[in-house]
């Protein structure tokens, strides 16, 4: 399943990260609808608003179905036929939609038949693994493997954000297949909401959870899913399957509380700092070896922090993906990415300042 995500990029940066080629092969930036409803966050939960990609044809009859817009929608689909005046009175959970029952439940079958397909945007999503023999659960942050060029991140200023010809070479957003619908209350404005489609977990995630989002890996998959004018429902559903091209790392339990919205939510955590080394044997030797390979911790429950106030980590904390990935590059990029966020944050908003 998928019950928590991160999508913290500023609006302009998110726009650039979603640049695409139109049907004529021209690079385009998606236009926004209701941009003021977008609230960046490291810790998004159901019933909050999240940005989704969808075809412009849903709103403009003369538009090309390959043209895209970004639209912040409520997470948790409210069916168009819902009769109550308050969406919170919906008696069933629609934050996720199982791929194997998508054509059996009217809440999802009806909007899917109308071509209401969308792509949910996120830095990545969180999942919790139940620790054996305890009631505790360890959170993980799951995302696309990241590559990093030498120029990456150097052109993230406002000038480059307005240049649609400049290729985005920073964090690769996770693109998840979704279904949306439009509900009209007795009074008030229309409510657009979505559900994330889920599939069986891939081999690399099966130890964490049995389900995962249906991830659209690559521009072709995203384009086909969105283009309901040219791609039929039957063809689009062929894109819904587990993928192995993901990586993940453990994170702090601070993410457990959805009210916590800081970079610490997705920063890699060292699980070993919570374990006491044994007095003798291989475990002690392993702990001694790790102590020579990684910086000492200030306190037992948290990673050491550098001058920027953010936790330090190394690629040893990134978990294995079934396919070869550049884990060092992913960790290094995430490190620099979070440090840049800290540097760009207004001084007045920083804690203890």
From Swiss-Prot:
Report the subcellular localization.
Chromosome
Region named Disordered: 292-353
Task: Kindly state the positions of the motif PIP-box in this protein.
Answer: 332-338
* GO molecular-function term, one example from the UniProt record: peptidase activity
| Domain of life the protein comes from | Eukaryota
Q: Where is the composition biased (Basic and acidic residues)?
A: 295-307, 336-353
The entry summarizes how activity is regulated as: Formation and reversal of DNA-protein cross-link depends on DNA context. Catalyzes formation of the thiazolidine linkage in presence of abasic sites in single-stranded DNA. Mediates the reversal of the thiazolidine cross-link in presence of double stranded DNA.
GO CC terms of this entry: replication fork
Q: Note one Pfam family from the annotation.
A: SRAP
Biological process (GO) annotations held by this record are: DNA damage response; double-strand break repair via alternative nonhomologous end joining; interstrand cross-link repair; positive regulation of isotype switching; protein-DNA covalent cross-linking repair; proteolysis; somatic hypermutation of immunoglobulin genes
Subunit and interaction comment:
Interacts (via PIP-box motif) with PCNA.
This molecule's function is given as: Sensor of abasic sites in single-stranded DNA (ssDNA) required to preserve genome integrity by promoting error-free repair of abasic sites. Acts as an enzyme that recognizes and binds abasic sites in ssDNA at replication forks and chemically modifies the lesion by forming a covalent cross-link with DNA: forms a stable thiazolidine linkage between a ring-opened abasic site and the alpha-amino and sulfhydryl substituents of its N-terminal catalytic cysteine residue.
User: Mind telling me what this protein is named?
Assistant: Abasic site processing protein HMCES
- Species of origin: Rattus norvegicus
């Amino acid at each position: 399943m998928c019950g928590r995500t991160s999508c913290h990029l500023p609006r302009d940066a998110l726009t650039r990260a979603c640049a695409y080629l139109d049907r004529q092969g021209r690079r385009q930036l998606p236009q926004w609808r209701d941009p003021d409803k977008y609230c960046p966050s490291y810790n998004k939960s159901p019933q909050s608003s999240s940005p989704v990609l969808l075809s412009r044809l849903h709103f403009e009859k003369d538009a090309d179905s390959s043209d895209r817009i970004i639209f912040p929608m409520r997470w948790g689909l409210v069916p168009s036929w819902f009769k109550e005046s308050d969406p919170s009175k919906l008696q069933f959970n629609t934050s996720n939609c199982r791929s194997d029952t998508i054509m059996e439940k009217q809440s999802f079958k009806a909007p899917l038949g109308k071509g209401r397909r969308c792509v949910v945007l996120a830095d990545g999503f969180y999942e919790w693994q139940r620790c054996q023999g305890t009631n505790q659960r360890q959170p993980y942050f799951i995302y696309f493997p990241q590559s990093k060029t030498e120029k990456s991140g150097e052109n993230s200023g406002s000038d480059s954000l307005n240049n649609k010809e400049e290729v985005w070479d920073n964090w690769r957003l996770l693109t998840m297949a979704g279904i949306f619908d439009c509900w009209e209350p007795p009074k008030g404005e229309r409510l657009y909401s979505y559900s994330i489609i889920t599939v069986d977990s891939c081999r690399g995630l099966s130890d964490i959870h049995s389900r995962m989002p249906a991830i659209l890996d690559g521009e072709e998959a995203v384009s086909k899913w969105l283009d309901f004018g040219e791609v039929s429902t039957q063809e689009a559903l062929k894109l819904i399957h587990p993928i192995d091209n993901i990586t993940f790392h453990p994170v702090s339990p601070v993410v457990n509380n959805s009210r916590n919205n800081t970079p610490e939510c997705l920063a890699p955590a060292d699980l070993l700092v919570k374990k006491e080394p044994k007095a003798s044997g291989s475990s002690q030797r392993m702990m001694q070896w790790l102590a020579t390979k990684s910086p000492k911790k200030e306190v037992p429950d948290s990673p050491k922090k550098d001058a920027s106030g953010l936790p330090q980590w190394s690629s040893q904390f990134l978990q294995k993906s079934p396919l070869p990935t550049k884990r060092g590059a992913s960790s290094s990029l995430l490190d620099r990415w979070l440090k840049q966020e800290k540097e760009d944050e207004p001084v007045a908003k920083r804690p203890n300042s």
